[in-house]
């Protein structure tokens, strides 16, 4: 949607099978949370806005086997996990006043409270709340129902096609960018 409206877009994509067709989209493919962190850090300085919509793993295995782990006599296998770097928090910590940072939250309980907490912790300008509690919304549907939360409050949107939801989000982003430009 951003590219369709004329923006130059850098898409940092994990291992997905989606094609990127628009000439205004430069795609950077990554395979790990560490690679996504590095690419995000490298691109953010020159960006007017960043939309963080990827569900990046919060943890990674402490050790990675280079061969198949065979089943022995043990019925259990213990994996030790390490936290990955928090991409959103790191960008929020270096965000300039002339940049926007947009996050997403998928919540199933305490939706408002959890989204507001994430908004503050990550220094987002606004956060898009997705709920799995609404019929026809979320994964496996062509529709979604969102709320946009900022420090002033919450705007709820009705169930719409995902293309319409994208337009709503970019409308809000565009309005915020115009406001930044007028006040700088």
Tell me what each language-model feature is.
Residues 25, 29-37, 148-152:
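Short, structured secondary-structure boundary patches
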Residues 16, 32-34, 108, 153, ...:
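Residue-level detector of flexible, active-site-proximal loop/helix-junction positions
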Residues 3-8, 17, 41-49, 92-96, ...:
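Generic secondary-structure signature for well-ordered alpha-helical cores
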Residues 31-105, 109-133:
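Glycine-rich phosphate-binding loop
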Residues 14, 54-55, 149-151:
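Generic beta-structure capping elements
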